[in-house]
């Protein structure tokens, strides 16, 4: 066997499928399989190489490639199965047997073996639904007349299905206690065991009832969204009847009522529960159809842009999120689904919804959008980038702002940092908006340097960090104290992010300090007139001295003015260690990699995100973990407008430094995959278990995608700084 050192996947495959081989060389075939398992992007690269070899005009080379593919399916595990089970690869196999493509030029031996492999996979891998779809499509078109006989050696042995876990009966402590009681000969212990069994059964029944209620709610939401979406698609102001409008209004009201229900479900669902993704998806679909109704029926403009409408599928997922479609579908119209990357002539998408004209520009400063928002109007399959209601709630709970792009430009109006900050305009708490309590949107912050109001080139202050959510049990303050509904006090804290172009050198000046003093006086008066506190005491904003001089803007967050609003009925937790990461900046070149294995945070459609952990903590902060986020693209399409956001529990803090870029070029077999790096800082002073949720938005080709996920595989906290 040749020297394995330095061998690549391509060299292994070239030797395994060499047309000069007299017989199948299993040394190189197994070496190819082992190399797939070793490499991080092994399955993604391997299927592309195999697709090219399988379509070889030389029969012997193609047959050897199919043998290699069969061996990989048996030896390379689920990661390889997932890549084979995508339409991108299945379309390449269909081209081999379809007369519309290569079927007339390929030998019968090759076509027969392809059909045998597809059929064996449908039997052994029922979870890969796309393989079954591809095989049934070939049968419908008459390419496959009958199911071929499968030899025993070609049959994949499916792994046994995992035993369904019952969180109640799988409780290790209760199981040990129950076993101990049952082994005892004491009648009291047996009676106690009986009580324990009954309590476990009741707990399981309550869990099942909760799951049933959740499924019923999700089904009801998806049905309402689907019906309202279909009616909006066919709505015409001239032709639609009053009955249709009444039905749409009723569906709209039901969707509005279900938004709170979904948020409550999301807050009650465990972080590791797989159904959390379904709840978030249903919430996104709900917000999308509500925005579409307001745009089409009521003529409103949602977040400064016109909402586009997409129909969710039967499972509640939006059609625009499909990974691809099969080719050769008997001339079926596929305009509503994404054309395959490998299809020779993709059909341009069409839509039944008239594209509404953009809203007229206001006389004030124009509302900025990120590059991903600007691409939201590319076609009907693009999802609306308007923040959903659940997104707003999550952002209020501490979702990190997207980091600025590098290199930033000097112009604040054109800088990508400014665009990304204004994309989260709902985080501007200074000016409340009707209908929102914790989150409000405003086009101009309250505090600005004195300047003529007509100037449109004045750069606004950076958006403040999120304010604490005020519980619904607290009575709403009067109109005179509306400042309290949006958490003014924490919003006044200065942001000292070092990488904010256009704002870094902005001084408030004397005028802004007078604004600050006037606002302080207004807060004191509002507390008394609103009836929330007595004139003699101030539980909302504690003060240390009766008469406080004018605060310089450099005053830290510990000063009374910057204390967050709290209520005695809520029970404020004791102040923990310092969480601020504003003054910490870790250059990428100074980071030393650790021996800890990287964690895959996202891996779909050739776009992959990995978390690499640094060996050391920042100086003076042993509670901060440095993570290098690597974004890789192995897809044949470019990935653009990449924005990563992160959120952690309230006892922690997360900060994303500017990424090295926002675009990834398409994959090339002769060059290494394109990559983006971004440094993430995670503060955990209480040394709790880390659970990080992320929101990822990007455009793969022309398709906009929004993904939400969670990562909890972080190194043990006690090992931070010495990984």
From Swiss-Prot:
Changing residue 276 to A: Loss of UBC-binding and ubiquitination. Abolishes binding to ubiquitin. Abolishes regulation of BACE1 degradation. No effect on interaction with NTRK1. Residues 364-374, 441-459 have a biased composition (Low complexity). It is found in: Golgi apparatus, trans-Golgi network membrane; Endosome membrane; Early endosome membrane; Recycling endosome membrane. Keywords: Endosome, Golgi apparatus, Membrane, Phosphoprotein, Protein transport, Transport, Ubl conjugation. Residues 1-313 are annotated as: Binds to ARF1 (in long isoform). A motif (DXXLL) lies at residues 391-395. Monomer. Interacts with GGA1 and GGA2. Binds to clathrin and activated ARFs, such as ARF1, ARF5 and ARF6. Binds RABEP1 and RABGEF1. Interacts with the membrane proteins M6PR/CD-MPR and IGF2R/CI-MPR and the accessory proteins SYNRG, EPN4, NECAP1, NECAP2 and AFTPH/aftiphilin. Interacts with TSG101 and UBC. Interacts with ADRA2B. Interacts with NTRK1; the interaction is independent of NTRK1 activation and ubiquitination. Interacts (via VHS domain) with BACE1 (via DXXLL motif). The VHS domain functions as a recognition module for sorting signals composed of an acidic cluster followed by two leucines (DXXLL motif). The GAT domain is responsible for interaction with ARF-GTP, UBC and RABEP1. Required for recruitment to the TGN it prevents ARF-GTP hydrolysis. Plays a role in protein sorting and trafficking between the trans-Golgi network (TGN) and endosomes. Mediates the ARF-dependent recruitment of clathrin to the TGN and binds ubiquitinated proteins and membrane cargo molecules with a cytosolic acidic cluster-dileucine (DXXLL) motif. Mediates export of the GPCR receptor ADRA2B to the cell surface. nvolved in BACE1 transport and sorting as well as regulation of BACE1 protein levels. Regulates retrograde transport of BACE1 from endosomes to the trans-Golgi network via interaction through the VHS motif and dependent of BACE1 phosphorylation. This is ADP-ribosylation factor-binding protein GGA3. It comes from Homo sapiens (Human). The gene is GGA3.
């Amino acid at each position: 066997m040749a020297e394995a050192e330095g061998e690549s996947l391509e060299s292994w495959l070239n030797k395994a499928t060499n047309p000069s081989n007299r017989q199948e060389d299993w040394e190189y075939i197994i070496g190819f399989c082992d190399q797939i398992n070793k490499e991080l992007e092994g399955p993604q690269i391997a299927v592309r190489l195999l697709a090219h070899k399988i379509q070889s005009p030389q029969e012997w080379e193609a047959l050897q490639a199919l043998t290699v593919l069969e061996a990989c399916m048996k030896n390379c595990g689920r990661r390889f199965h997932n890549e084979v089970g995508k339409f991108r690869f299945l379309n390449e196999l269909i081209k081999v047997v379809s007369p519309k493509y290569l079927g007339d030029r390929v030998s019968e031996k090759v076509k027969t073996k392809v059909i045998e492999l597809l059929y064996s996979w449908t039997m052994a891998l029922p979870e890969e639904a796309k393989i079954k779809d591809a095989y049934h499509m070939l049968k419908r078109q008459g390419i496959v007349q009958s199911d071929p006989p499968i030899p025993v050696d070609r049959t994949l042995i499916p792994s046994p299905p995992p035993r369904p876990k019952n969180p109640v009966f799988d409780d290790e402590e209760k199981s040990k206690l129950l076993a101990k009681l049952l082994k005892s000969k004491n009648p009291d212990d047996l009676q106690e065991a009986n009580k324990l069994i009954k309590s476990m059964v009741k707990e399981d029944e309550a869990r099942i009832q909760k799951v049933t209620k959740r499924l019923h709610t999700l089904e009801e939401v998806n049905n309402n969204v689907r019906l309202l979406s279909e009616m909006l698609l066919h709505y015409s102001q001239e032709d639609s009847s009053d009955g249709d409008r009444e039905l749409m209004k009723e569906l709209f009201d039901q969707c509005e009522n279900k938004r709170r229900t979904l948020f409550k479900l999301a807050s009650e669902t465990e972080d590791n529960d797989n159904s959390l993704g379904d709840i978030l998806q249903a919430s996104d679909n709900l917000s999308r159809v509500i925005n579409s109704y307001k745009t089409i029926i009521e003529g409103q403009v949602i977040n400064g842009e016109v909402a586009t409408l997409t129909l969710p599928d039967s499972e509640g997922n939006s059609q625009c999120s499909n990974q691809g479609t099969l080719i050769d579908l008997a001339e079926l119209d596929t305009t509503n689904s994404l054309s395959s990357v490998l299809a020779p002539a993709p059909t341009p998408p069409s839509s039944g919804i008239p594209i509404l004209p953009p809203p007229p520009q206001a006389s004030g400063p124009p509302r900025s959008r990120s590059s991903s928002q600007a691409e939201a109007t590319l076609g009907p399959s693009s999802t609306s980038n308007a923040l959903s209601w659940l997104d707003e709630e999550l952002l209020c709970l501490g979702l990190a702002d997207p980091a600025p792009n590098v290199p930033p430009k000097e112009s604040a109006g054109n800088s990508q940092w400014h665009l990304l900050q204004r994309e989260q305009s709902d985080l501007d708490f200074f000016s409340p908006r009707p209908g929102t309590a914790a989150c409000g949107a405003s086009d101009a912050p309250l505090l600005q340097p004195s300047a003529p109001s007509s100037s449109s080139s004045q750069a606004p202050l950076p958006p403040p960090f999120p304010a604490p959510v005020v519980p619904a049990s607290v009575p709403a303050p009067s109109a005179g104290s509306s400042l309290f509904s949006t958490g003014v006090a924490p919003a006044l804290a200065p942001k000292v992010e070092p990488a904010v172009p256009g704002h870094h050198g902005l001084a408030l000046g004397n005028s802004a300090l007078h604004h600050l003093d006037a606002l302080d006086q207004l807060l004191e008066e509002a507390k008394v007139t609103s009836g929330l506190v007595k004139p003699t005491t101030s539980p909302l904003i504690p003060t240390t001295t009766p008469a406080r001089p004018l605060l310089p803007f450099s005053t830290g967050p510990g000063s009374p003015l910057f204390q967050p609003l709290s209520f005695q009925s809520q029970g404020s937790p004791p102040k923990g260690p310092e969480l601020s990461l504003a003054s910490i900046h870790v250059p990428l070149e100074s980071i030393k990699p650790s021996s800890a294995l990287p964690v895959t945070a996202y891996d779909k459609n050739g776009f992959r995100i990995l978390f690499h952990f640094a060996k050391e903590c920042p100086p003076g902060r042993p509670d901060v973990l440095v993570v290098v986020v690597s974004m890789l693209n192995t897809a044949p399409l470019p990935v653009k407008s990449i924005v990563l956001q992160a959120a952690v529990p309230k006892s922690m803090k997360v900060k994303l430094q500017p990424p090295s870029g926002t675009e990834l070029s398409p994959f090339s077999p002769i060059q290494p995959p394109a990559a983006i790096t971004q440094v993430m800082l995670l503060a955990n002073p209480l040394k709790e278990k880390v659970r990080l949720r992320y929101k990822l938005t990007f455009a793969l080709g022309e398709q906009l995608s929004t993904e939400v996920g969670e990562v909890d595989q972080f190194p043990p906290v006690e090992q931070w700084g010495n990984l």
